[in-house]
């Protein structure tokens, strides 16, 4: 069976399909439905307060008895200067004025928020905990493993995958450059540039260098992508954009429609929205902010500075001023219920296997 392997056994799920964290766009209904249909639904908790995370976990637990996960951002510890913030506030002033917004106060509480989230995951016995932007400390990994929680890391290079395995991750997601949303990169490359290795190149190279199960992410939207990923050596897939446009997704309708009506040439990788590289649909804000390249405050500072602009723009229909995360396969996105998407994915793989045989 294409779905019976080390990955599905480790996660105690039927199908090797993981719904990506998609911070800010997941709902309890989305997560629970994916899990109820045999995949692994994940709460995108990167921006959650402890109270919000507790509420979401309880909602999901009330909707499913199947395994699910919580996706967390590992604190980045990036330094920044007050001058950077002052300059960015000056550059963002026209947007705030147009949207009638006040200048925000930067409040960095990443570390405290992350540690609190870990304790919440343990308290509520969440079966799986996923990480991006790095690897948590040895102490945190030991705490989670002591609670019998399965750990999933993220890698955009072979070295990052090896680091995840050495740290004690049970599974690693190989995130190709096609993936929508934030890049999970955390190790510096020889040329000091953000690694942008495509899924087809990344998967087999990571598979050859680690012994833990590898999950393919980036551009996977249907049964063809699932089967192709397995042929490359991945034991499963992580899908974001495919779930982003479903009825149960918490993404703004403006974003959903933008993805559904975009082409493969419409996405770019930019750090202007959050201070960390992410793939999304190009727009006026990205083009305007390009002139400040090299002067963007790091995540999470830039994320806080642009947060109210992005949220207000999205809620008032200003698609040119908000982030619209999407992978490179928007033409394959569909608007349907999650259970329909899951059924379609499974049927597509079955049909393809019949043809191949």
Curated annotation (Swiss-Prot):
Its cofactor is FMN. Keywords: Detoxification, Flavoprotein, FMN, Monooxygenase, Nucleotide-binding, Oxidoreductase. Its EC number is 1.13.12.-. InterPro entries: Aldolase_TIM, NMO. One of its GO terms (biological process) is response to toxic substance. Binds 1 FMN per subunit. It catalyses: 3 propionate 3-nitronate + 3 O2 + H2O = 3 3-oxopropanoate + 2 nitrate + nitrite + H2O2 + 3 H(+). It holds the Pfam family NMO. FMN binds at residues 71, 175, 180, 219, 238-241. GO terms for molecular function: nitronate monooxygenase activity; nucleotide binding. CDD domains: NPD_like (cd04730). P3N is a potent irreversible inhibitor of the key enzyme succinate dehydrogenase in the Krebs cycle and electron transport chain. P3N has been shown to be a toxic metabolite to bacteria, plants, fungi, mammals or any organism that uses succinate dehydrogenase. Nitronate monooxygenase that uses molecular oxygen to catalyze the oxidative denitrification of alkyl nitronates. Acts on propionate 3-nitronate (P3N), the presumed physiological substrate. Probably functions in the detoxification of P3N, a metabolic poison produced by plants and fungi as a defense mechanism. Belongs to the nitronate monooxygenase family. NMO class I subfamily. This is Probable nitronate monooxygenase. It comes from Staphylococcus haemolyticus (strain JCSC1435).
